[in-house]
Amino acid sequence: MAHVSLPHDAKAGPTKSEVRAVLLSKLDLTPTDHFAEVGSCTGAVTVEAARRAGRVTALERKPERVETSRKNLAANEVGGSVELRESEAPEGLPTDADALFLGGSRNYEAVLDHAVEHRIDRVVMNVSRLEVAGAATAAFRERGLLDEVVQFQVSHGYELAGATSFDSQNPVYMLVGGAGEVAADGGKAAMDDGGAATDGGETSTDGDERVRGTERSPGDSTGGGRR
């Protein structure tokens, strides 16, 4: 995974590199794709997406974060393929996007409605709070968008008393689906009767259903959720 330089601070942590790796594997961006992002913040995901997609439209409602994203894009020599828009989604979202990422939960239901209306093929949303993850899973399912829900946690090792201990980050819930071919079955192939599946293709978070084991692991990603 190519290095992402983030010399400018948005007073909000960027999406961690390990989370970006999983995110990008799910988005599966190609040079012909138009990628839309809700909440560019520091621009970490924006930079990664611009290295893969043909076009990127990134929305950010806070002007100071738009400027931070702009500076970090320049620091990574990312230019003409990215359009930064100071706007609060769903206002300002393109109507021809192939893939969409929601880095937070603000106005997410209206954004999902936009994805359905404009048949966005791949939709991924990152959530850090359990209660929001449950509500968002229901919103994805109600709109026929849900393909899978992945929950994972990153831990980094550090030396402690001559041995290795681990510092764990908060869990991330990643909702994956789309309104195009990716989730044309409304998620039925991924879910039995309802509930959120965990990573690994086995059991759900409530333990009563199974999801197909076709998703790629973080190790399959070519590169590497809050940005």
State each model region's role:
Residues 42-53:
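Conserved SAM-binding loop of SAM-dependent methyltransferases across substrates and taxa
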Residues 116-173, 225-226:
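C-terminal substrate-binding/active-site "lid" region of AdoMet-derived donor-dependent transferases
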Residues 107-115:
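A short, conserved alpha-helix within the catalytic core of class I
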Residues 55-60:
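Conserved SAM-binding motif I beta-strand of class I
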Residues 97-104, 122:
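Short SAM/SAH-binding signature in class I
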Residues 1-31, 36, 41, 67-74, ...:
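Class I SAM-dependent transferase core
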Residues 63-99:
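S-adenosyl-L-methionine
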Residues 162-194, 199, 206-227:
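Core SAM-dependent methyltransferase catalytic element
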